[in-house]
């Protein structure tokens, strides 16, 4: 009888420790993300930039916490990933925070020997900010030139007198467009893909559908081409699409694309009902 009680107490203590470790991991993840966004919030507070927190990032964090608590591991120790998060969250650097988040996620995978959906979201989130804030800025010259050429190829039938020069679209009426980082689909797509995968996992799916992600990227590319084509009409139209109501419509379209997994879920339910 005493042996059973002792075993039960040991199991209970082990479970409490694991819950504490998992909770600490989640809190440190959120603190590291806050540190990664701190500089952007500082710039925004000085009225020198846009609000730095995308609704899709907020949604991803919600899904991460929900899935992680649902699938948390009650056996493995998490000392190393927790220590990495605690270290990197104290470094006053946005890039360091995202690198720390990526390292901690990979170490979590190694220590627990599990690769569940919440961890995929965490890795995608870290890579999204590392890509946007660092890697894309380094390689943007080549990417923007190639993307401008592609946009020019699509728009050529509608603007026969248009000329493509590096990352510029030159029109005969003097209304020229420069395709910069903010206009690139490679900059805008990362958050949409993140939101799409978050919704996909929230609906109970487990594996990443590479085919659908590729289709989504193609849709984002075509949407961006149409947007730039409309901006090329004249300057007032450019202002409307780039800064006015047109910008809000475009952002709404991006959010709607990110929640398209709901359509898959609805179609599956309809199919089951018919069967």
Where are these regions (language model features)?
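Hydrophobic N-terminal alpha-helices or hydrophobic patches in metabolic proteins across all domains
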Residues: 2-275
């Amino acid at each position: 009888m005493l042996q059973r009680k002792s075993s039960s107490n040991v199991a209970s203590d082990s479970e409490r420790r694991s819950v504490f470790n998992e909770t600490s991991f989640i809190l440190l993840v959120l603190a590291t993300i806050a540190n990664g966004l701190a500089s952007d919030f500082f710039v925004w507070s000085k009225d020198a930039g846009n609000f730095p927190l995308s609704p899709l990032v907020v949604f991803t964090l919600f899904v991460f916490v929900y899935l992680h608590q649902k699938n948390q591991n009650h056996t493995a120790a998490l000392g190393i990933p927790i220590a990495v998060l605690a270290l990197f969250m104290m470094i006053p650097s946005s890039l360091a925070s995202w690198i720390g988040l990526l390292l901690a996620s990979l170490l979590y995978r190694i220590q627990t020997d599990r690769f569940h959906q919440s961890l995929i979201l965490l890795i995608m989130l870290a890579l999204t900010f590392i890509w946007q804030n660092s890697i894309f800025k380094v390689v943007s010259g080549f990417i923007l030139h190639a993307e401008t050429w592609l946009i020019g190829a699509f728009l050529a039938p509608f603007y026969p007198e248009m000329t493509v020069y590096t990352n510029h679209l030159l029109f005969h009426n003097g209304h020229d467009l420069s395709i910069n980082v903010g206009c690139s689909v490679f900059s805008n797509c990362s958050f949409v893909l993140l939101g799409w995968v978050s919704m996909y996992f929230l609906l109970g799916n487990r594996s990443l559908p590479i085919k659908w992600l590729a289709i989504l990227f193609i849709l984002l590319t075509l949407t961006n081409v149409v947007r730039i084509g409309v901006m090329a009409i004249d300057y007032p139209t450019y202002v409307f699409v780039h800064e006015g109501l047109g910008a809000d419509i475009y952002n709404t379209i991006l959010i709607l694309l990110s929640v398209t997994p709901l359509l898959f879920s609805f179609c599956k339910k309809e199919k089951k009902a018919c069967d």
